[in-house]
Amino acid sequence: MLQVYNTLTRKKEVFKPLKEGEVSIYACGPTVYNMPHIGNYRTFLMADNIVRSLEYLGYKVKLVMNITDIDDKTIRDSKAAGMSLKDFTDKYTAEFFKGLDMLNIKRASAYPRATENIDSMIELTQKLIDKGMAYEKGGSVYYRISSFPDYGKLSKLDFDSIIIGASVDVDEYDKDNPRDFALLKTSTPEEIERGIYYESPWGKIRPGWHIECSVMAMNCFGPTLDMHLGGVDLIFPHHENEIAQSEGATGKPFACYWIHGEHLIVEGEKMSKSKGNVFTLPEIVGKYGGEVVRFMFLSVHYRKKLDYSDAFAENAKNNYLRLKETLENLEFSLESAENTDYPGDEEVLKILPELETQFREALEDDFNIPKALTVFKELSRTANKYLESEKNRHVLEKLYSLYRQFSDTLGLFSESGKKEIPTEVMRLVEEREAARKKKDWTVSDAIREKIKSLGYIVQDTKEGPNVKETE
């Protein structure tokens, strides 16, 4: 039975979808104004892990992740870059998708852009005005948070701390200073000159950040969805304001389960440009490889801070390579194994269902991926122990099938499989085998080094030489 930690109630709850067997998820995506750092991608990967886990558990999942392509930051930085807002945000949207591919993050069902949903934002704003929950001031439209008694229920904000009538124009502000926030902002003369405005009943405007997500989520799912995901930094004001806007307009719960991922820190400190410890994904992937970075993110539960360091990444790399080697050895052994019974077969076949149950239970425990990884490592140990003895093809197929189920659910080894070895390398392998048969170890070792210089290693097994690319 799946249990999910709900930020709204601050406890684990049994998950009950709105529609049996199906799950609707909205995840806050990137604000495309720069290269996303590794902390951003940890949150995007959290969404991917949740989707993969739900699919493994038998659910049909629809994930929608927005792209914020108009807000304070995109307008400010596109101007500094001397680019149009569209060209600027298109550039960083493309970088965002490249990063998803680096980490083998599956594509969401949809990636709506804020600029494609302006009409709906104007409609929602008008609805809130009609209900007395929003008002126009100086060409901008503000949400009256005192009109929503539940304001603060997600962030546990003290409603009495609200300053009645005070408003704020910036998208991000402190929880200790709750104010009426902007739904739509009057465009400045400079923004109008740059073409960054939309006609509305209140003049030339552009949207505030918070209304964008409310509209895109409801346009995709209707008034209520199963899960809303994001980083802990979005709980206030962003997600709090989403609830106020959406539930204020519809009178219905906006999201049943709010799921938030913790921060990524670097060697115990928060990432900041002044400390020089802000790393982009391409920097880290260039150093360790995309799947190693993914594995590193998998090793810490999404509700715990991930403390990044080179030592932590190196440890993740070593663990990843051991698991990958097991997969390659299974694939190699399957090529020559026959259906002959051997002692130990029954023991392995008995262990596999137990490991499958443990893996499932880990995912059902608030998407406990680190716990699932521990089960995966146990499967690897079981496989390696079996590979040391005589091998039954039927048992190997069972091992390989479960190994692949686990790795696919974790998003690992997507490019694995028997790769074509270059002809020159295979010729050298044959020459080395001939030297070994003659017990000419000097020639055999020299050929091994030549093969290594070409980027391959040779492992001598009972079944013959196993050739692999070096990492």
From Swiss-Prot:
Give the enzyme class. ligase
Localization, per the record, is: Cytoplasm
Reactions mediated catalytically: tRNA(Cys) + L-cysteine + ATP = L-cysteinyl-tRNA(Cys) + AMP + diphosphate
The record, for Pfam families, names: CysS_C (PF23493), DALR_2 (PF09190), tRNA-synt_1e (PF01406)
Extent of motif 'HIGH' region = 30-40
Q: Which cofactors does this protein require?
A: Zn(2+)
- Which residue stretches, if any, does this entry annotate as coiled coil? none
The protein's predominant localisation is cytoplasm
Would you tell me the protein name for this molecule? Cysteine--tRNA ligase
Q: Which organism is it from?
A: Methanosarcina barkeri (strain Fusaro / DSM 804)
Classification lineage: Archaea, Methanobacteriati, Methanobacteriota, Stenosarchaea group, Methanomicrobia
Gene encoding the protein: cysS
